[in-house]
Curated annotation (Swiss-Prot):
Family label: Belongs to the UPF0301 (AlgH) family.
SUPFAM superfamilies named among the record's database cross-references: VC0467-like
GO cellular component term of the entry, any: cytosol
UniProt-recorded name of the protein: UPF0301 protein AnaeK_4073
Name of a matching Pfam family: DUF179
PANTHER family: UNCHARACTERIZED PROTEIN YQGE, UPF0301 PROTEIN YQGE
Regions annotated as coiled coil: none
């Protein structure tokens, strides 16, 4: 049965219904960063890409790559944040005493988001920056598109919970989100939709 889409989906999560056939979003957990009359913006937080943090940093500065290697972060996979602007780098991190705040937007629940080279460099150079994820690309929705998709049952909204991003292993994030909705992943069936590619 279709449900009414909530007025404000960000900050929060969208949990993809199993019937969502779009290969960019099947089985995905999307962190919604913006939702307004002009559309919506979010990031898939459970889809690893083919490159590592070292690959990204090596293209910027060899010293940054060495710093990431020393911190044990060089082999972390960069996530595919979505199909829009797949070359654009975003940084999702947990703000803390050593994490920079300039150039970032606080989302709530212990999460912040930015996209500048300066922010990335500051996080990598910080003595103890806390957890962070690098994402390439984002998911975008036209005006009223995400509301329609939620109403059709392609996505189920979930309130923002920072631990889903940094304390739950990437391969368990979707299943954990489904269970937090009070649903059984094996029996969770609805249909349709997909963000802009």
């Amino acid at each position: 049965m279709p449900q009414d889409a909530p007025a404000g989906l960000a900050p929060g999560f969208l949990v993809a219904a199993p019937a969502l056939a779009d290969p960019n979003f099947n089985g995905s957990l999307v962190l919604m960063a913006e939702h307004h009359a002009q559309g919506a913006l979010g990031f898939v937080v459970n889809r690893p890409g083919p490159i590592t943090v070292a690959d990204v940093l090596g293209g910027l500065d060899a010293g940054l790559r060495e710093r990431a290697e020393g911190a044990g972060r060089a082999d972390d996979l960069v996530l595919v944040g979505g199909p829009v602007q797949p070359e654009r780098l975003w940084i999702l991190f947990r703000p803390g005493p050593a994490a920079p705040e300039e150039g970032a937007v606080a989302l709530g629940a212990g999460l912040a988001l930015g996209g500048s080279r300066e922010l990335l460099e500051a996080l990598v150079r910080a003595r103890d920056p806390g957890p962070y994820l690098l994402l390439l690309g984002y998911a975008g929705w036209a005006p009223l598109q995400v509301e329609r998709e939620v109403g059709e049952g392609a996505w189920v909204p979930l309130p923002l919970q920072g631990d889903l991003v940094f304390d739950v292993p990437m391969e368990k994030r979707w299943e954990t989100a489904v269970r937090r909705l009070g649903l059984d992943p094996a029996g969770f069936l609805v249909g349709g939709g997909g963000a802009e590619a």
